[in-house]
C-alpha cells in the first residue's frame, strides 16, 4: 500500500462540532448584542444585554439520564442585563434567565425529549450579486443582476432590448435606474463619472428623464405604495428602512465578502447594509456585460452556494425568538410603572424557549437520527440538504439544481444521494472536505512546484472559486519517491473543463483518490469498476445494514473502516496514555500516566460501556471490551467495540462463500438462495429491541389504575405479572399477552341495560372498570429485558394528566428467513427465496457447501463488476489467510491493476499445499462445483468466492400482515390500509378489471359490498358465516350513498325505480329508497356456505 491509504482523514463530524462551538462562542453573543439596547417608545428606559458575559448552568441530567427520563439534554442560559432609567439616572443590574439551550453531545447529536436528533446541514444560495444572461424571443441578449441579501428586500437590475436600465425592488413594477440612484442622494456627475460606459446609460436618461432628488423620492413612493398620497419624507423613510437600516436589511458577513469580491470594492467587513457605491458598482458591472466585459454567474456553482450548519440555523432561530421578546419588553416598559421595573420582570423567557423548542422539535432540518448502524449515524451528521426553510422545495427544484456540477469535485459526493423525489437535493459531504468561516466548502490539495508534489508541506484548502483558476491534477497520478510526477502529460481540471498538460504546468494535486467521494461510498472496494447507479444503491444500502450478533469485518476492505467506526462515536476510544486497571462488561478503568515517564500518574478515568440499549431504529446497541487489565493503552486506541464493529473496524455484514449460478429458478429476478448453515450458526442473526409504553391518566371519572386485578381475565394470562400488574423481567411474551394491566373507570353511559339491572339488584358490588391493558401487538414476540416505572411521587417529570408511566423493553433474536432482504456493497440486492438444507447445496471439490447462490445474470446488465473482483480477491484472501485493504481507483499502479492483483493472488493461493484446485489456468476465477443432491459435477465451471453480504433492516417480520375483520374508515366505511392500522389489501381499479374480464360476478359483488363498505350487509354476512347460514343479499355500499348525497347537493334528483306487478297483473313503477336498507331476503342462488335444514328455512321465512 502507498501512503494514500494511510493518510488519516480529518475528524469526520467536525462540521457539527465546529459549528456548535462557533454558536456558543460567537453566534449567541452576536445576536444578543444586535438587540441591545432595547428602549421604550419615549426613550426614557433602556435595557442592555451584556451578551459576552452570558452563563450556562450545569445540565440537570447527563446524556444517559436524559435518554432514560425522556428529557432534553439542555442547559439554562443566563444573561446579565442592565436597566437604565434616563430620567432618574438609576441603573439596575441583574442576571436574567432567558431559556433552555439543548447541548450537543460528544457524538454531534442533540437529545430532545429522550430521542437523539441530528441537525442536518443546509446548502443555500449565498447572499451577494448574481448576473444572468437572458435571450428574448427575437434572440436579443438582455442581462439582469440580482442583489440578494441575507435578509431584507431583493434588488434587481435589468437591461431591456432597447438598452435601457431598469430596477425592481422586491419583484414590484420596474423603475428607471436613475430614480433609485437620485433617490439615494447621488449627483449626476457622481453617477456618470463612476460608469465605464456613460454613453450607454445616457439612453436611459433620454428616454425616462432625469428627475431631481425630491421627484425621485416621490416617484419611488408611488411605485412601492400605490394608492397612498406620495410625500418626499415618506419616500426618504421608505428607502432608509428598506436598504440602509441594519435591523431590516442585512447582507451578512458572507454577502459583504461576495459583493466586494465580485464588484472589486473594498468596503469594511462590518458594513452589512448597502451603500450607494454598491448600487453604482452593480449597475456599472451590468452595463459592462453589454460590452462583453465581466462574466455572468452560475448559481449552481459551489462558489455561489454556502452551507448553513447547526450554529447558524440555531442563531437564526434565536433571532426569531429575540424579535418576539423585544416586542414584549417594549410593551411592558410602556405599561408598567417605571420605578417598580426590574430586568427580570421585563424579560419573559417564553418566546425564546418556544423558538428553540420549535426548531429542535419540528424544523425540517432537525431529524430523528438514523441509528441503524455506525455508518448510518456518521452519514446522517454529514448530510447536506437543499430543502428546508429558506431552501428549495421538491416540486420547484429543476434538473439543473439536482445535477452534478464540476465544482462538486472533492466537496460533495457525486454518488451518494437518495433515489426518488429527493435525488440530487440531498447529498453527502466528501471525505476530506470541510466548511470554512464563510460557509463555503473547501477541499485539500498538495502544492506542486515545477513538477514535484510537495507532500512534505501541509495541504492547502481551496474553495470552488479559488480552484477554478488553478490547474489541478487528480490524486491517483503516478509519482516517484521524491514526488516528481511521472510521464509527459498529466490529466488536469482547469476552469471546469478536463484537459491534459505537462507536469510543470500543474499547480495542485488532489490529496487522495478517495477525496471526491463520501464516507459511505469509500467503503465500497473496487468502486471504480461499478456503474454509478449501482454504487449509489450500494452506498445507501450499507446504511441500512442491521448490526449482527457476531460482527465480522470484511476480508476485502478499503482501509477507511477503522476511522469511520471511530468517528461515528459507537466505539470507546482511549483519551490518554495509561494502564488498564479494571475491565468488566459495564466499565473500563484506565490509570493515565505521562507518555515519557510512567511514574507520573493522573486521576483514574472510568469509561462506561453500553449494554443492550435500544437504538432509534430498534436495533441493539451493545459494546464489548477489547482490552485486558494490565494492558498499556495509547491515545486513540479502541478500548471497546460497538455494534457492527469488530476490532475497532466497521463490520456491517459477514464474509460468506458465494457462487454465481442459477439453481432451479430460485434465484430468478434477483432472488437469493441461501444455505441452512446461515440460520443454524446464527451467521445472520440480529437482536431487535422494541419499546412499549403505557400511561395511567387522570380521567373525568377518576384515575386509571395499573393493577393485577383485571376484569374477565384468567389467572393463566396473569402468571408473569408482579403484584402491581407489571410483567417481570425475563418473561417470554407472544402476541396478545398482557405486559401491563390497566383498568379505566367506566361511565354510566358505557353500561348495557342488563348490567344496570344487576347493579340495581346487587348494589355496588361489581366494579365498573374497563380493561385497558397494554398487550403485545400482533405478530410480535420476545423476551422482556427491561422495565422502567416513572411516577409523580418519585419526582419524575411526566406528561400532563399522567400519574404513572411504564415502559417495557422486549428483545427478540431474528434469524434470517425467507422474505428478508440482503445486499452486497455494490448495489446487488435481493430477497431470500428459499433456504436449502446444507446437504442439498452445491459443494466445492474439498466438500465445502456453498453458503449463498446469486444469479449470474445480475452482473452484466447492471455493470457492477466490482462484486466479482471482491468475490475473487476474498477467495484468495481466505485461502491465504489474509485480509486486504484496497483503496479505490488503483489504475495509478498500472493498467488493469485490479485484474492483475486478483489474478496473481489466486495463483499464489493455488500453490499452497492441497489448494491446487483453487485456481484453474484454463478458466481463471472459476471452479468445478458439484450438485449436492446427486454428487454430479455441474456441466461448466462456476465463479466461486468470498463476498461480504449484509442483512438489511427491511425484515419480513416487520412487513408481513393479514386481516380478517378490523377497523373501517369513518367517512367511506371502507377498511383502512397498512399494517399499523390493521388494514386490508386494496383491491384496486385494475384488479377489478381483471375479475370483470372473467365475469366473476359474485366475487365482484362481494368485493364492492360486504367486504368493503356495505355496513349492514357486512354485519349480517359475518353473523351468517358464524352461524353457518347462507349469506344474505348485499345492500347498498356506503360510498354509493355518499355519491348520491353529493349529486343531490348539486340539485340533481337521483332515484332508483323498480317495476312491480300489481294484483291485477298490471306492471307499476315504484321508487326504491336506497338510503335505508329494507328487509333483506336470502338470495335465490345456490348456497355454498352451509346445507340447510328444514328448521333453518322455516326460520328464514318467518
UniProtKB/Swiss-Prot annotation:
GO term, biological process aspect, one: DNA-templated transcription
Keywords: DNA-directed RNA polymerase, Nucleotidyltransferase, Transcription, Transferase
Disordered, as annotated region: 1076-1102
EC numbers: 2.7.7.6
Assigned GO CC terms: DNA-directed RNA polymerase complex
Keyword Plastid: no
Biological role stated in the UniProt entry: DNA-dependent RNA polymerase catalyzes the transcription of DNA into RNA using the four ribonucleoside triphosphates as substrates.
Name of protein: DNA-directed RNA polymerase subunit beta
Gene: rpoB
